[in-house]
Amino acid sequence: MGLHPGVLGIGNAYLGAAFAGVIKVSSRHAEIITRIRMLRTLTLTMVNRVKNVKVLFGLNAISAWLGFGGSFIVNTFDLVPEGEVEPHLFGPHAPGMSGALTRIIDLFGYFTIWSNLLVAVTITMLFLNPNKSSQRFKLFRNTSLLMILMTGILYHLLIAPTANPESWNIYTNALQHYITPAITVLVWLLVGPRKWFSLRMTISVFAIPTAYLIYTFARGAIIDRYPYGFFDVIEYGYVSVGTTLVMIYIAGYVLALLFLALDKVLSRNK
């Protein structure tokens, strides 16, 4: 006995609706699967980026700590005999452990040590927590960038032509004045952090360098010794040294503005 055409029509309608529902559910399911896959890909990308960022921060930290730590050990244990000391510069020191304390005190009188130590501390903190972003930390991080770049430039222009490092100092000198400055700037260019520079920050980053200069010249006035020849007010006078410092500040501010400009450009391309 055949089915009534009306029944067949109703059945076909139900089947059609059922198939449409299945197709709709399948489409929705496929969309959910696609979104899950996209989220997974994005998550893996972020995880890999964090890993790569930490690797770069880690290498930067190793370089900075090696340079600073090497100098600290060399000076503590007097591993490199002290050569002839120029008038009004740090030294001479007693040989061996008897002169360890004065050597370490003088060691912390160098801008190179301040900049490398600041890089070592800030980059290690970024390695431990790449998302660290307090305003104070941003200031320290950006200051370390400017100071380490100035360290490399000033050493190359004003000190390297007459410098003659020996023994272990050859390696610590290369690390602190060439390798760490280059790595630090390169890592910043590659992975930031971004959007940390502002016009106000280009002024704030001079707080620590200025504190260093105040300490250096106050101490120098007491002991008649300075870390660098171009700081020697006894030999060259305050006007000449002051002029040099003004030129250094101007050059430093130009570099700070360059960091600001690069930060804005790299933030847009991120």
Report residues per predicted region:
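Alpha-helical transmembrane segments of multi-pass membrane proteins
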Residues: 63-84
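Perimembrane loop-to-helix junctions flanking transmembrane segments
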Residues: 80-104
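Membrane-interface transmembrane-helix boundary segments in multi-pass integral membrane proteins
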Residues: 50-55, 223-259
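Residue-level detector of structural "landmarks"
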Residues: 13, 18-20, 29
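Membrane-interface loop-to-helix entry segments
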Residues: 113, 170-182
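Juxtamembrane "helix-exit" motif on the non-cytosolic side of transmembrane helices
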Residues: 156-165
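Alpha-helical transmembrane segments in multipass membrane proteins, preferentially the mid-helix core
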Residues: 181-197
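Membrane-interface helix-boundary motifs at transmembrane edges
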Residues: 129-140, 192-200
